[in-house]
Amino acid sequence: MHINWKKTIIIALDLVLGTYLVFAFTRFNKPDETKLLCTKVNINIQDEMTNGFLNAKEIKKRLEVRKLYPLGEPLKEVNARMIEETLKTSPFVKTAECSKTQDGLVDIYLTQRMPIVRIKSISNEDYYIDDHNQIMPNTNYTCDIIIATGYINKWYAKIYISLLSKALMTNELWRNQIEQIHVLPDRGIELVPRVGNHIIYIGNLPETNLIDKREQAINDFVNKKMNRLEKFYKYGLSQA
């Protein structure tokens, strides 16, 4: 078989030239990261406008204290991983992601732990419980959530009061009407409404060691008690 070496060499040279042109185009059109500065920082916080404790100003301040705020810095020196790890040390941050773009932007995305109840026990403990039933420290920020007072230790707060708060917050009427949970020495539960000069006693929460059944038992208990109370509000008070 006769090989046309001239044609083969031309094709090979074309391939080499094409590869070089592609490389040169991408190489020389890529911004020099050593000279590119961070021109803008976007801080995005999920649910920032609800009951969370995080805001962009606080995040900026935290990074500035650690000398990690990237605005005006060479993009090559911006350590996205270090920014993420620093923000994750906050007890109010659930997840943190940081990324850089070739046009000088640094994007920071955060999700936050959401408080569902504030605990102010008779032993002067003051902390929050989040939506995963875990303790959050007290903070200078305030938010409009239920306060639980009285004879509450941390175990009872995490295991039972958190579930009671969730059950109340799932109903729009009780989320707006109930402002305080009070636990008596025998663990009887009193609810304090925003409107009206009265106390609502609902008794003791059902207790069980079975985690998968505990939440359902408390939901059923609360729904039964509060449905009766709602009927009293609608019919009993209207006839008084």
Outline where the language-model segments fall.
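Charged, solvent-exposed interaction patches on well-folded alpha/beta domains
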Residues: M1-I45, G52, E58, E64-T89, ...
